[in-house]
């Protein structure tokens, strides 16, 4: 299938004097319908001994569902149910780490995250903190983690976030929303089972899928774009267009969106996201708006920066009869807007990717507030 050429307009150049990052990738992946059933076989060789448990962090949505009975519990393994109603917080990570350390004499054999982006990010952060001193907020930033994380496995139950493949774990801290960006964050193993996404409600499916779509648009139109990120971004965009604008079967749609999420995550791993994500962080920090919805609330007003992408987005919204919340920022005070603007502008790498090195002169605080006021 052909995607729109003007969505892939950045010219790729090379520079022999550039020092390139040596990014990590997930070393092992299982993909396929029903592949969750192989989890026991995957974990068995990684168990240290009978006293070193596997800790399963699971979205509490599944607490009374059949999925729990399929988890290969042995010895003193523990399941911890976690609510995904709110964005993952640094203090939440610290509390889980403390609970594990107080409960078990031996360090766990590994951490398994089962859920959407919130659970996948929590599991990555817990795996890091169990092998590193201090608190989660100490590692919010870039390359601050000094020791490898505990063995950890990611199993997404919704598609779109790219958290299963990324080298970041985005956390809401006391002062900022920022990821733990580290080579030690990436999962050691991922299981991609499209059947696990069957229970996802329609709107959540759409908003999380749009996270993936926006990853593609921001990556493919960014100044950080390179042939590596472009190849993944183009494939992810192609899959998103098939899923959200073409008539494919439900089963095929689940497969394609799960792979779009993977490819979209790979694209931004070697480039960066852009304006929608930076502004969404502000909405999440101040108003607690979930990431996928926040991206959509912002992206609909970014036609000046991503004209073709926003046009496609509106077609997707119309096709699936999605109603975005209105008047979200209507009653905010000037102090509220100052917080939104400061949080968003703090994401400097995202702005540089979107607008170039002169981004501070292009996106002034006043101009940014004007966009927020439309939401």
Positions of predicted regions on the chain:
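Glycine-rich phosphate/pyrophosphate-binding beta-alpha loops
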Residues: 160, 266-290, 295
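Carboxylate- and glycine-rich phosphate/diphosphate-binding segment that chelates Mg2+/Mn2+
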Residues: 168-270
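Catalytic phosphate/nucleotide-handling subdomain of diverse soluble enzymes
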Residues: 281-320
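Glycine/threonine-rich beta-strand-loop-alpha-helix active-site module
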Residues: 91-195
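C-terminal charged capping/lid subdomain of soluble metabolic enzymes
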Residues: 2-11, 16, 24, 313-375
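ATP/NTP phosphate-donor binding region
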Residues: 2-110
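Short alpha-helical scaffolding segments that buttress acidic/His motifs in well-ordered protein cores
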Residues: 213-217, 257-265, 279, 299, ...
């Amino acid at each position: 299938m052909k995607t729109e050429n003007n969505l892939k307009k950045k010219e790729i150049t090379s520079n022999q004097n550039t020092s390139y990052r040596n990014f990590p990738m997930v070393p092992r992946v299982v993909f396929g319908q029903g592949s969750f059933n192989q989890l026991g076989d995957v974990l068995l060789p990684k168990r240290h001994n009978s006293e070193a448990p596997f800790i399963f962090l699971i979205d509490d949505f599944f607490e009374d569902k059949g999925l729990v009975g399929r988890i290969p519990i042995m010895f003193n393994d523990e399941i911890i149910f976690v609510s995904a109603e709110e964005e993952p917080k640094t203090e939440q990570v610290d509390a889980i780490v403390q609970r594990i350390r107080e409960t078990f004499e031996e360090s766990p054999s590994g951490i398994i995250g089962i859920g959407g982006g919130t659970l996948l990010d929590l599991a990555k952060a817990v795996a890091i903190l169990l092998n590193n001193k201090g608190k989660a907020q100490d590692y919010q930033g870039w390359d601050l983690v000094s020791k490898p994380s505990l063995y950890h496995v990611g199993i997404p139950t919704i598609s779109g976030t790219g958290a299963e493949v990324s080298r970041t774990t985005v956390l809401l801290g006391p002062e900022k929303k920022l990821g733990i960006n580290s080579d030690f964050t990436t999962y050691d193993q991922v299981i991609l089972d499209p059947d696990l996404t069957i229970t996802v409600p329609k709107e959540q499916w759409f908003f999380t899928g749009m996270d993936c779509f926006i990853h593609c648009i921001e990556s493919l139109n960014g100044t950080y774009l390179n042939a590596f990120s472009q190849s993944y971004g183009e494939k992810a965009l192609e899959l998103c267009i098939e899923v959200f604008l073409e008539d494919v079967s439900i089963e095929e749609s689940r497969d394609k969106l799960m792979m779009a999420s993977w490819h979209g995550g790979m694209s931004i791993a070697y480039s960066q996201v852009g304006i929608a994500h930076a502004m969404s962080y502000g909405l999440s920090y101040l108003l607690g708006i979930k990431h996928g919805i926040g991206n959509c609330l912002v992206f609909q007003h970014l036609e000046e920066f991503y004209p073709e992408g926003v046009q496609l987005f509106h077609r997707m919204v119309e096709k699936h009869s999605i109603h975005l919340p209105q008047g979200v920022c209507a009653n905010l005070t000037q102090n509220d807007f100052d917080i939104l603007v400061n949080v968003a502008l703090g994401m400097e790498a995202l702005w540089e990717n979107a607008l170039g090195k002169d981004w501070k002169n292009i996106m002034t605080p006043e101009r940014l507030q004007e966009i927020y006021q439309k939401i």
